[in-house]
């Protein structure tokens, strides 16, 4: 199950800074930069038992790799709920305000394709950030 997420200011829960609209998953979407917001991505316990848990060798993109592995590699069925499931404060390891963290996150996302033996363009690390620009609110 996956749905929408909104980011809010750390000190103002009513000030929305980013709206992450997801969509139905279709095979191949990860290669375009799309992925569901990890806090609003839920799977049954059995999926973890069958396909594994988070990789601890990925500092920032362990959530991305897990969703890629479940949805793209193992074709786990998903259902999209077109409503906000999570309201979350800004911050986190891949904070958009730090270029070095964004670059590291995208390199780890690229590596996630290689780990799962899935094809990906070498331009992916440039494509992925641009897919999120329209989510930002001022």
Can you annotate each of these PLM segments?
Residues 1, 6, 77, 128-135:
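Solvent-exposed, well-ordered amphipathic alpha-helical segments
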Residues 3-4, 9, 15-105:
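Conserved nucleotide-sugar donor-binding catalytic segment
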Residues 87, 91-138:
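Hydrophobic helical membrane-anchoring modules
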């Amino acid at each position: 199950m996956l749905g929408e997420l909104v980011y809010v200011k750390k000190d103002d829960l009513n000030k929305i800074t980013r709206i992450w609209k997801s969509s139905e998953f279709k095979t191949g979407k990860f290669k375009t930069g799309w992925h569901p917001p990890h806090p609003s991505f839920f799977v049954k316990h059995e999926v973890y038992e069958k396909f594994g848990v988070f990789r601890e060798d990925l500092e920032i993109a362990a959530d991305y790799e897990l969703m890629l592995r479940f949805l793209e590699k193992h074709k786990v069925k998903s259902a999209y709920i077109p409503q906000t499931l999570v309201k979350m404060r800004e911050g986190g390891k891949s904070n958009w305000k730090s270029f070095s963290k964004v670059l590291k996150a995208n390199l780890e996302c690229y590596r996630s394709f290689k780990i799962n033996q899935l094809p990906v363009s070498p331009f992916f690390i440039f494509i992925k950030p641009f897919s999120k620009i329209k989510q930002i609110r001022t």
